[in-house]
Amino acid sequence: MEHQTSRRNFLKIAGSSAAVAGAGLVSGNANAAPAKVNVGASTLPYPITAVGKAKGLKVDAPVSFNYPDASSPCVAIKMGQPTPGGVGPNNDIVAHSILCTHMGCPVSYDASAKTFKCPCHFSVFDPDNHGQMVCGQATENLPQIQLSYNAANDTFTAIGVTGLIYGRQSNIL
């Protein structure tokens, strides 16, 4: 007497067998000690780049510069109120990459709303809150350029980047 298995029953049996075999592989290492990994602090060699003088900035008037290299457009903005990550006499100067984290379109600063807006897919970012993504297609915050302020000569410089600039595997090429 021949026993025929339907296609549906065959798939049920094969799927169950694969699940049991997979569970055995996963649980086989459950009691093993985790491998020790030496995670040292790595610092990317960001350049120190002069951006401008604090007194030369006007509130809500972006100043363009490139950082960390010539193919990375950025803007510095005097927000007019103390801002997280801000530098200067009033801690109100921030800088961000202007490449949208969704598809790399250049964002523009809207002074009336105090936001960066992407014209391609309508993402909106908040420079008052570390470039946080407010709405739109982007899933990451706008990269913030880390600034340093020298009160003696009223200059601020770019010293690093928080976040990944669009289209890169590393901010330093």
Curated annotation (Swiss-Prot):
Signal sequence span per UniProt?
1-35
What's in the keyword line of the UniProt record?
Answer: 2Fe-2S, Disulfide bond, Iron, Iron-sulfur, Metal-binding, Oxidoreductase, Signal
Signal: present as a keyword of the record? yes
Record's keyword annotation contains Iron-sulfur: yes
Record-linked InterPro entries: AioB/IdrB_ssu (IPR014067), Rieske_2Fe-2S (IPR017941), Rieske_2Fe-2S_sf (IPR036922), Rieske_Fe-S_prot (IPR014349), TAT_signal (IPR006311), TAT_signal_bac_arc (IPR019546)
Question: Which coenzymes or cofactors are required?
Answer: [2Fe-2S] cluster
Q: Which reaction does it catalyse?
A: 2 oxidized [azurin] + arsenite + H2O = 2 reduced [azurin] + arsenate + 3 H(+)
Q: Which CDD domains does the entry mention?
A: Rieske_ArOX_small
Q: What does the record say about induction?
A: Induced in the presence of arsenite.
Post-translation changes = Predicted to be exported by the Tat system. The position of the signal peptide cleavage has not been experimentally proven.
**SUPFAM superfamilies named among the record's database cross-references:** ISP domain (SSF50022)
What disulfide bonds does the UniProt entry report for this chain? Answer: C105-C120
EC number(s) per entry: 1.20.9.1
Cofactor, free-text remark: Binds 1 [2Fe-2S] cluster per subunit.
Q: What is the uppermost EC class here?
A: oxidoreductase
All copies of domain Rieske, residue ranges: 60-156
Partners and quaternary state?
Answer: Heterodimer consisting of a large and a small subunit.
Record-stated family: Belongs to the AOX family.
Quote the PANTHER family the UniProt record gives.
CYTOCHROME B-C1 COMPLEX SUBUNIT RIESKE, MITOCHONDRIAL (PTHR10134)
Q: Which NCBIfam families match?
A: arsenite_ox_S, TAT_signal_seq
What's the name of the protein?
Answer: Arsenite oxidase subunit AioB
Q: Which gene is this protein's source?
A: aioB
